[in-house]
Amino acid sequence: MNLLNGNIKPIYFKYFSAAFGSAMITSVYSLVDMAMVGQYQGPDGTAALAVVAPVWNIIYSLGLLMGIGGSVIFSTVRGQETQKSRNENEYFTVAVIGSVILAFVSWAAIIFFDKPILLFFGADSSLLSLAESYLTPVKAVIPLFLFNQMLAAFLRNDNHPELATASVLAGGLFNVVGDYIFVF
């Protein structure tokens, strides 16, 4: 990939289509979540899921924080031909360590402070138990979801945006099938 002398259009569309595809897949499986829960639990289920959504979004954002931040520095160092003294893999390692720390802190916060967090995000006495039941599986996959976001960013910046999109697609399919199995 030669960004200085090559044709930028195919490179741009390769990355654009992968990013757009990932965003669309994420949007679709979020809608499927809401639709299935709404069909099974009704308005209270949808409201409880809306209370849990900010927790999920924060974990997603922490994964993006480590992934995008680390992968941009990784790519910058990789692209600098004059500065080979720093190994770009060090930045990947730092992102992994940072993700482990953030996953552990997030996991501990949600395990020990789940009720106050849900109340902060709008749960009331009628929604709290339902929101807690939706949050239970989230507790189990916090590290996986955070690492998925972090690794997808590194894959994109390591010239493999199609692998990042494939991982998002696999997660989306698992989510839709899991919704059907676990909700109904």
List the predicted regions and their residue ranges.
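Short alpha-helical transmembrane segments in multi-pass integral membrane proteins
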Residues: M1-A19, F74-P143, V177
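Residue-level signal for short hydrophobic patches within transmembrane helices
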Residues: K9-V28, V55-L62, A140, A166
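Extracytoplasmic
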Residues: A18-Q39, T46
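Transmembrane alpha-helix boundary and packing residues in multipass membrane permease domains
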Residues: A19, A23, A35, V72, ...
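Helix-loop interface residues and adjacent transmembrane-helix termini in multi-pass membrane transporters
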Residues: V28-L31, Y40-P43, V77, N157-D158, ...
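Interfacial/gating helices of multi-pass transporter permease domains
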Residues: V37-N57, S126-L130
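Small-residue-rich hydrophobic transmembrane alpha-helices
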Residues: T46-A108, F145-A164
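Alpha-helical transmembrane segments of multi-pass membrane transporters
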Residues: I110, L163-F184
